[in-house]
């Protein structure tokens, strides 16, 4: 099957985060099964000529251009817009990782106009909004593509309710739950040396990286040799993180290495004794799945989409707010507790979030979409 995946942005800083990681994981697994899969996206930070593949996946990348002061939503590319129709006509199924932007929406509209089966995956990015730009895009395009898609993939019941609210009326009638999958990782040795606590996600307000810095003194009181890593592309919180590090006198204990590529991310996760993601209302974070896949116990908040799974499997700890982070980390640093949580984390990802099962479900969706388009 010929499948086109469209995602907003692939950059050297990995600024678009989880949706790109999900798209690449799916593309790689589909290619392993013999399917002809291609990726299209904007590109930023690369030297010319732009890469023609990403992690082994053939890619048609277009230099990002900012046309509106709206974050990722204000980026586009004339060449991508001009070539969208040709790209979708070459595919049997078009899979769009949909956001309210000037990349994925035009590709989705092109697929509908070309009569190609359209599968949408929103990653929690399309929810009810009072912003004028969101309301305009919803009226002009978002509702149209959601209603016209052969399938709309959602992660959680909360996300589905949001999508129904955006669509209005009776809501979606072609919704399919598809969890994020994570590739299997070989079991490695437990991390050695002093405790190492990791945060690796975008540095933005909702993800609350400062909360980990605030938890550091209480952890250091019990483990004075511990170190902390706050990694990820800056989306407005790096200055606040650095300011808090200075205020608490933690410059020798907390490092901020910036964005991590896929290989470095895996390396850092393996070196970490505990992975902490303090974010609120996080739909289904790939970084937490990746941490558990290598056996690193996690600390997440109770509004995290994976909180129930983590709690039930005892693959880490779930906290209600910032004050719970330090006690949770200290608990997981106990040798026997960490060993148990590490084994549980690997078991959870292998049994519940394995790529084989996720891709099997996705291929069923593709087959139904393609067959329906031929009827």
Task: Give residue spans per PLM region.
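Conserved donor-binding/catalytic core segment of Leloir-type glycosyltransferases
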Residues: 4, 189-216, 229
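N-terminal strand-loop element at the rim of the active site
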Residues: 7-13, 28-75
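Donor nucleotide-sugar binding/catalytic pocket of nucleotide-sugar-dependent glycosyltransferases
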Residues: 135, 141-187, 257
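Glycosyltransferase donor-sugar binding loop
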Residues: 200, 227-242, 258
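Nucleotide-activated donor-binding/catalytic signature segment of Leloir-type glycosyltransferases, i.e.
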Residues: 241-260
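Aromatic "clamp/platform" in nucleotide-sugar-dependent glycosyltransferases that forms part
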Residues: 280
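Short hydrophobic beta-strand element within catalytic cores of glycosyltransferases
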Residues: 297-301
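Conserved acidic donor-binding segment of nucleotide-sugar-dependent glycosyltransferases
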Residues: 312-323, 331-336
């Amino acid at each position: 099957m010929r499948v086109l995946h469209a995602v907003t942005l692939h950059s050297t800083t990995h600024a678009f985060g989880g949706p790109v990681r999900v798209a690449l994981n799916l593309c790689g697994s589909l290619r392993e099964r013999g399917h002809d899969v291609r990726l299209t996206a904007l590109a930023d930070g690369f030297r010319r000529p732009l890469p023609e593949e990403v992690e082994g996946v053939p890619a048609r990348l277009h230099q990002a251009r900012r046309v509106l002061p709206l974050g990722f939503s204000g980026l586009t590319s004339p060449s991508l817009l001009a070539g969208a129709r040709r790209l979708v006509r070459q595919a049997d199924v078009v899979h769009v990782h949909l956001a309210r932007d000037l990349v994925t929406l035009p590709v989705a509209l092109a697929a509908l106009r070309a009569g190609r089966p359209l599968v949408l995956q929103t990653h929690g990015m399309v929810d009810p909004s009072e912003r004028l730009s969101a309301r305009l895009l919803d009226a002009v395009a978002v509702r149209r593509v959601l209603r016209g898609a052969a399938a709309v993939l959602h992660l959680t019941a909360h996300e589905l309710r949001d999508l129904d609210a955006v669509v209005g009326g009776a809501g979606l009638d072609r919704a399919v739950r598809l969890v994020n999958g994570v590739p299997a990782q070989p079991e490695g040795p437990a991390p050695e040396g002093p405790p190492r606590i990791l945060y690796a996600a975008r540095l933005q307000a909702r993800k609350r990286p400062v909360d980990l810095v605030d938890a550091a003194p209480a952890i250091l009181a019990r483990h004075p040799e511990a170190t902390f890593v706050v990694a990820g592309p800056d989306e407005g919180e790096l200055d606040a993180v650095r300011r808090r590090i200075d205020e608490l006198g933690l410059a020798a204990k907390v490092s901020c290495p910036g964005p991590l590529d896929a290989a470095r991310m895996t390396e850092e996760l393996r070196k970490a004794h505990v992975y902490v993601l303090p974010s609120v209302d996080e739909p289904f974070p790939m970084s937490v799945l990746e941490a558990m896949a290598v056996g690193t116990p996690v600390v997440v908040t109770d509004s995290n989409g994976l909180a129930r799974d983590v709690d039930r499997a005892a693959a880490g700890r779930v906290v209600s707010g910032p004050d719970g982070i330090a006690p949770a980390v200290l608990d997981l640093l106990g040798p026997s507790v960490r060993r148990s949580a590490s084994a549980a984390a690997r078991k959870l990802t292998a049994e519940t979030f394995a790529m084989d099962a996720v891709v099997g479900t996705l291929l069923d969706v593709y087959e139904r979409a393609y067959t329906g388009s031929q009827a």
